[in-house]
Amino acid sequence: MSAQIDPRTFRSVLGQFCTGITVITTVHDDVPVGFACQSFAALSLEPPLVLFCPTKVSRSWQAIEASGRFCVNVLTEKQKDVSARFGSKEPDKFAGIDWRPSELGSPIIEGSLAYIDCTVASVHDGGDHFVVFGAVESLSEVPAVKPRPLLFYRGDYTGIEPEKTTPAHWRDDLEAFLITTTQDTWL
């Protein structure tokens, strides 16, 4: 049997892994509901599936489970306020937030980098969380202008910033920066 893991140490160590920030939304009983979520991932291309992991005591999860549908909103680096609001205990998280309904009726938050509209495919036990598989029903196009994603690392927001030694025309084009090869490239 392994030694007892200290929860703060566990959280701190896992904080070394940088994640994107999403807001998972639905509408239940005609009320928009959502929460900030870092535990989101692609699961399968065929069939198209994603997953996220809400806490078992989440009221937002209860609304998503009851509605049977949800929309994943991928946040941009300019949406820290949106992330903070949906990560709070604020009772009306949608106050002052512009959104429109997805094809399934879940909120798409204006200004998000991308959205993925899903139905709940299955729910699995994950300790103090559930692991929710979502069947992708529709999704946004890739934006022509590519804003940078909002990231979370070591308990704080962060972003993608190319090294200053990267040529200026590549620093201004995130996609070029991410696919540029140098003598140190592993590929």
Swiss-Prot record:
* Reaction catalysis annotation: a reduced flavin + NAD(+) = an oxidized flavin + NADH + 2 H(+)
Q: Name one GO molecular function term.
A: flavin reductase (NADH) activity
Q: What does this gene product do? A: Catalyzes the reduction of free flavins (FMN or FAD) by NADH. Subsequently, the reduced flavins diffuse to the HsaA oxygenase subunit.
PANTHER family noted in UniProt = FLAVIN REDUCTASE (PTHR30466), FLAVIN-DEPENDENT MONOOXYGENASE, REDUCTASE SUBUNIT HSAB (PTHR30466:SF11)
Q: Which Pfam families match?
A: Flavin_Reduct
**Functional pathway:** Lipid metabolism; steroid biosynthesis
Q: What else is known?
A: Cholesterol metabolism contributes to the survival of M.tuberculosis in the host by helping the bacterial multiplication during earlier stages of infection and to the dissemination of the pathogen in the host.
Q: Which GO terms describe its biological process?
A: cholesterol catabolic process; steroid biosynthetic process
Q: Which top EC class is named for this enzyme in its record?
A: oxidoreductase
Record-stated family: Belongs to the non-flavoprotein flavin reductase family.
Question: By which gene is this protein encoded?
Answer: hsaB
Q: What induces it?
A: Induced by KstR.
Question: What is this protein called in UniProt?
Answer: Flavin-dependent monooxygenase, reductase subunit HsaB
Q: Which organism is it from?
A: Mycobacterium tuberculosis (strain ATCC 25618 / H37Rv)
Keywords attached to this Swiss-Prot or TrEMBL record, sorted alphabetically, are: Aromatic hydrocarbons catabolism, FAD, Flavoprotein, FMN, Lipid degradation, Lipid metabolism, NAD, Oxidoreductase, Steroid metabolism
Give binding positions for NAD(+). F152, Y153, R154, G155
Lineage, top ranks: Bacteria, Bacillati, Actinomycetota, Actinomycetes, Mycobacteriales
The UniProt subunit note reads as follows: HsaAB monooxygenase consists of an oxygenase component HsaA and a reductase component HsaB.
